[in-house]
Amino acid sequence: MMNDLTWKEFERVDIRVGTILYAEEFKEAIKPAIKMTIDFGEEIGIKKSSAQITDHYNPESLVGIQVAAVINFPKKQIGPFMSECLVTGFTQSDGSIILAVPQKGALNGSRLA
């Protein structure tokens, strides 16, 4: 278990919901991954991300799914790809990742409360 953080620290993490518009295999990645283009609504716009989620997802199955992503981390260069947000998920006992998705449709750009 990690150290406690303050409410103020938690509020600094900007987690928003967005809809995956496009997904493709990240062929250049060292570990199997999928590149995604995600719509976070008018205010935030479109952002790109990469995630190692191939154990449970293929690119075609991701299009149209809403995901929760951290949008205020610095951009990160991953090989030839620039990731602009961090798609969130839950690590399973085997190390695979299950995406964090809203149970019901949410407005793109809505902030996690």
Regions found by a protein language model. Name each.
Residues 1-113:
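Phosphate-backbone binding interfaces of nucleic-acid-interacting proteins
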